Amino acid sequence: MAGRSLASKAEPTAGAMDGAEKAEGQDTSSQKIEVEVLINRINEAQQAKKKANEDLGEARTICEALQKELDLLHGEKVHLKEILSKKQETLRILRLHCQEKESEAQRKHTVLQECKERISALSLQIEEEKNKQRQLRLAFEEQLEELMGQHKDLWDFHRPERLAREICALDSNKEQLLKEEKLVKATLEDVKHQLCSLCGAEGPSTLDEGLFLRSQEAAATVQLFQEEHRKAEELLAAAAQSHQQLQQKCQQLQQKRQRLKEELEKRGMQVHAQAQSTQEEEAGPGDVASPKPLKAPEEKDLELHTEQDLMSS
């Protein structure tokens, strides 16, 4: 800018030399001032440039440091991302494992619950079976006692002494009925003989006798004798039939007694086996109580009860 002004001033006209010299002096002073100003500006610019260079160097240093730090942070970020990815994968695996464990625990809990229910059902079934066996045993014992009582009554009924007494009583009743029948027959014969003698006698009969024979009292007497004779015959027939029925019943009862005796022997064996199995179930393994066999008096009582049962039937 100062060079262009000097070049423009170097072309003065000849008429203005003096003015030019004056102006040149002024220009020189102004140029000096401008040069000083320019120098000052240049110095300031250089100082500013130097300062700017220093600031730029510091900024570059800071930028490099920040870049390095950024690179470090970026690397750390990548590393942290890798760690996060690994942790997430580990967490996913752990969650899956936890879900599997929970599913397994739920399944085991379900199986355990089913086992408990089955155990409860089996325990209830065992208890019901025990109660059923106990009831069957009690019913069998009651039936056995009843059979023993019937057998005892039958034995009492079929004792030889009692049978002999009953047969003697029947024979005596039969003889008594026969005697009564003979007596009634004799009485009837006498009455008939008297009637015949009265009806066939020669000579006139008295009026009273004729009236008596034709009266209702004579007819009633004859009818009474006939009824007595008929009743005696019926009693005799009933006694004979009763005696025959008693003998048949005695034979039937003896046969039934034999059958019941065989049945009691079979049932005694069954009771023995059932009692032994029940005692084994109640006592448990290793503590089985040996059942007591029936003694001779008990067997005799059993037969007596069976005979009583047959008698009542």
From Swiss-Prot:
Region called Disordered, residue ranges: 1-31, 261-313
Main location: nucleus
Record's subcellular location: Nucleus; Chromosome
Coiled coil: 29-281
Acetylation recorded as keyword: no
Record's keyword terms, sorted: Cell cycle, Cell division, Chromosome, Coiled coil, Meiosis, Nucleus
GO cellular component, as recorded: chromosome; synaptonemal complex
Stretches with biased composition (Basic and acidic residues): 295-313
An individual GO BP term: synaptonemal complex assembly
Subunit annotation: Homodimer. Found in a complex with SYCP1 and SYCE2. Interacts with SYCP1, SYCE2 and SYCE3. Interacts with SIX6OS1.
UniProt family annotation: Belongs to the SYCE family.
Function: Major component of the transverse central element of synaptonemal complexes (SCS), formed between homologous chromosomes during meiotic prophase. Requires SYCP1 in order to be incorporated into the central element. May have a role in the synaptonemal complex assembly, stabilization and recombination.
Protein name (database record): Synaptonemal complex central element protein 1
Organism: Macaca fascicularis
Source lineage: Eukaryota, Metazoa, Chordata, Craniata, Vertebrata
